[in-house]
Curated annotation (Swiss-Prot):
<dbReference type="InterPro" id="IPR013657">
    <property type="entry name" value="SCL35B1-4/HUT1"/>
</dbReference>
<feature type="short sequence motif" description="Di-lysine motif">
    <location>
        <begin position="319"/>
        <end position="323"/>
    </location>
</feature>
<feature type="transmembrane region" description="Helical">
    <location>
        <begin position="205"/>
        <end position="225"/>
    </location>
</feature>
<feature type="transmembrane region" description="Helical">
    <location>
        <begin position="15"/>
        <end position="35"/>
    </location>
</feature>
<feature type="transmembrane region" description="Helical">
    <location>
        <begin position="51"/>
        <end position="71"/>
    </location>
</feature>
<keyword id="KW-0812">Transmembrane</keyword>
<feature type="transmembrane region" description="Helical">
    <location>
        <begin position="253"/>
        <end position="273"/>
    </location>
</feature>
<comment type="function">
    <text>Probable sugar transporter.</text>
</comment>
<feature type="transmembrane region" description="Helical">
    <location>
        <begin position="136"/>
        <end position="156"/>
    </location>
</feature>
<keyword id="KW-0472">Membrane</keyword>
<protein>
    <recommendedName>
        <fullName>Solute carrier family 35 member B1</fullName>
    </recommendedName>
</protein>
<feature type="transmembrane region" description="Helical">
    <location>
        <begin position="85"/>
        <end position="105"/>
    </location>
</feature>
<keyword id="KW-1133">Transmembrane helix</keyword>
<dbReference type="GO" id="GO:0005789">
    <property type="term" value="C:endoplasmic reticulum membrane"/>
</dbReference>
<keyword id="KW-0762">Sugar transport</keyword>
<comment type="similarity">
    <text>Belongs to the nucleotide-sugar transporter family. SLC35B subfamily.</text>
</comment>
<feature type="transmembrane region" description="Helical">
    <location>
        <begin position="169"/>
        <end position="189"/>
    </location>
</feature>
Length: 323
């Protein structure tokens, strides 16, 4: 009975984590597009937002403050013994993955970038197996394969051979995506190591990774001079400050659920949730805007739901209890 109650509690917690990540990052995506793709000013003086590093810097600061509040109210009696260099390494790989992914958009189109990032569970699993000697049940491999394949099919769009304008060979963009995926895997390995050896709490993980990220990004935007251009831009268009703060708040809430998922279920489950979140966001867009779904996309839909269902039922069969 106790085991059944524990499984029920774990299932409810996983559902809360999934819904938290989905809702927060659904609005996060809308705000991100509003900020980065919107035009500011009128007539010939219209400007675009060009300060990606500064935006992430504000985001990391708010994340760290939010995590500090959570620790103050919920984890004040818990001592964190995780070594600082692990947080620093994890933040470097995390930032490197973000920068590589965003830079790839200069060379490949957005669907290619999203499709590449949808394979994130693969490096998390491969590096977990090779570096940490971690063992996953065969069912976990099959679930990840089904989910990645389903997302890939859903996002796949046949190339229009008649247009001829979107042709490109394997180059810098694809290499940057591979680098981003590798760094994603290293981030997952670092988080797994912290959980296994130091029982790192989700709020402490969120606080210190974002503090280190803020330190690295702060040095970067001061060194490049982007900080002063960003502040000048917000002075010219003060309305953007509201969107940036709301964007950062949804990021902080989303990261709370992400780190909670990492601590209780591991980085692989977290990567599965974040990958399928993209799928559900696109699916919601299709429903809301009445966009047609092709037969291939319906196959992808079925595969994703099948993978999620099988993972919930069999994916944790040999997993040891979390401390």
């Amino acid at each position: 009975m106790a085991a059944g109650g524990a499984q029920g509690s774990g299932g409810a917690r996983l559902l809360v984590c999934f819904l938290g990540v989905f809702v927060c990052y659904f609005y996060y995506g809308i705000l991100q597009e509003t900020i980065t793709r919107g035009t500011y000013g009128e007539g010939e003086k219209q400007e675009k937002f060009r300060f990606a590093l500064s935006l992430v810097f504000v985001q990391c600061i708010v994340n760290a403050l939010f995590a500090k509040l959570l620790i103050q109210f919920f984890d004040s009696g818990k001592t964190d013994r995780t070594q600082s260099w692990l947080y620093a390494a994890c933040s470097l790989s995390y930032l490197g993955a973000m920068v590589s992914s965003n830079s790839a958009l200069q060379f490949v189109n957005y669907p290619t970038q999203v499709l590449g990032k949808s394979c994130k569970p693969i490096p998390v699993m491969l590096l977990g197996v090779t570096l940490l000697r971690k063992k996953y049940p065969l069912s976990k491999y099959l679930c990840v394969l089904l989910i990645v394949l389903g997302v890939a099919l859903f996002m796949y769009k046949p190339k229009n051979t008649g247009s001829g304008g979107d042709e490109h060979t394997f180059g810098y963009g694809e290499l940057l995506l591979l680098l981003s995926l590798t760094l994603d895997g290293l981030t997952g390995v670092s988080q797994d190591h912290m959980r296994a050896h130091f029982q790192t709490g989700s709020n402490h993980m969120m606080l210190y990774i974002n503090l280190w990220s803020s330190l690295f990004l702060g040095a970067g935007i001061v060194f490049t001079g982007e900080l002063w251009d960003f502040l000048s831009f917000t002075e010219r268009y003060p309305s953007i400050v509201y969107n940036i703060m709301l964007f950062s708040l949804t990021s902080a809430l989303g990261q709370t659920f992400i780190f909670m998922t990492v601590v209780y279920f591991g980085p692989l489950t977290c990567s599965i949730i974040t990958t399928t979140r993209k799928f559900f966001t696109i699916l919601a867009s299709v429903i809301l805007f009445s966009n047609p779904i092709s037969s291939i996309q319906w196959v992808g839909t079925i595969l994703v739901f099948l993978g999620l269902g099988l993972d919930a039922t069999y994916g944790k069969g040999s997993k040891k209890p979390s401390h």
